[in-house]
Amino acid sequence: MEAYIRQKRATPGMVQASDMQLVRPMSAVNRNGREVHAYDGPMQFMMSPNNPDQILTSTGNASVTTTPTSPYSDAPLEKLTPSSQDSEDEESTPVDILPSSNSFDSTRHSADHLLTHSAPISPALMNNNGGSHHDSSSGKSVEHSSPQASGHNDTEGDVVGPIEQWVTQPAPQGVLYKCRITRDRKGMDRGLFPIYYLHLERDYGKKVFCLAGRKRKKSKTSNYIISCDPTDLSRQADGFVGKLRSNVFGTTFFVYDSGKKEDHGNPRLDLAVVIYDTNILGFKGPRNMTVLLPGMTEDDQRVKISSADSQQGLLDSWKSKNMDNVVELHNKTPIWNDETQSYVLNFHGRVTQASVKNFQLVHDSDPDYIVMQFGRTSDDIFTMDFRYPLCAFQAFAIALSSFDGKLACE
């Protein structure tokens, strides 16, 4: 199994970061204590024998330019030993090979395959002429985006109020939350049911615990319990926030809050749907995913949508093209780089290893506004950054869906 997983990770379907230049190889001594800003690993991380996503090649080891660690760099964390029985990193989905490019920013994301009737991310800013990153629901790209639209002027967010309330509140506009997900395989069942921890990153390597999630063992489909209490991951716990549930093929994931389906007074709400494209032909490449979110009101509050009691939920609205109260996001299409023979995205130094899990979510109206990005930094550590209109719980659940096995996406 371990040899099979290593062979799967040697395929060119991994997504790497595009914000680094290749230079002459450096010795292992010179690389110690430096932070790498790379193609999410090429070629230093990809050639490392310890890298879980390494690409086997007959050429010599190539290295990458390094820079001194900045105040916002990831603090060094101890790597956890992965279990040989874990197969969460195997799956991939087809994607068209795009023309090679030295910079991802030089090629705009093609939106021809997106629905053009998705609700805007922020209806309150539709009529704002000050270079807002939001447009009308026509689906056309914004021609003149301000620096804030691309997130360059966003302030780093912090937890405000009780953690149980903060994790479900949409992020304020102009605020970027930088988080880290740690996968702990040391739990029960030989690592087959790891626990995932979400922390909000702070200055000087500090972090604040936000959420924890674990897959339920006795369930017909993948079912993750997400809680603010890492010591009690059950639906009866006081810290229970919601759950992530998949269909039998692992191609569609539903995110619900803590409400109960049969409770008519406080029905369970749909907070997100994650749809992964199927790959029945076995093509190799990064995953294609669609994320559906409830629309936002003019005062930046989430529209309440429930699929309980035979009501039309997020997925039903999307299928019937009733998109007035639905926000549709897609993963930003990576660019194929001939030099590194890999798919690349610009993660701005936040991702340091190639992985099929690495992705960025954007809206049809402005592909430059990264709503969420997620990627690997070591064997069991991943970064997760999100901004408006997502909340921490939605972003964490979307990230958890990328860990789950997908039969039809293999």
Swiss-Prot record:
Task: Name the segments for region: Disordered.
Answer: 44-109, 121-159
User: Pfam families per the record?
Assistant: Tub (PF01167)
Q: Which Gene3D superfamilies match?
A: Tubby Protein, Chain A
Q: Which InterPro entries match?
A: Tubby-like_C, Tubby_C, Tubby_C_CS
Subcellular location, record wording:
Cytoplasm; Nucleus
Instruction: List the record's Gene Ontology CC terms alphabetically.
Output: cilium; cytoplasm; nucleus
Taking the first listed entry, what is the main subcellular location of this protein, grouped into a coarse class?
cytoplasm
Q: Does the keyword Cytoplasm apply?
A: yes
Compositional bias ranges of the Basic and acidic residues kind: 132-143
State the UniProt keywords alphabetically.
Answer: Cytoplasm, Nucleus
Transmembrane stretches, start-end: none
Q: Name one GO biological process term.
A: protein localization to cilium
Q: Which PROSITE patterns match?
A: TUB_1, TUB_2
Q: Does the keyword Nucleus apply?
A: yes
- UniProt lists compositionally biased (Polar residues) regions at 47-72
Q: Indicate the family of this protein.
A: Belongs to the TUB family.
The protein, known as: Protein king tubby 1
Can you name the source organism? Aedes aegypti (Yellowfever mosquito)
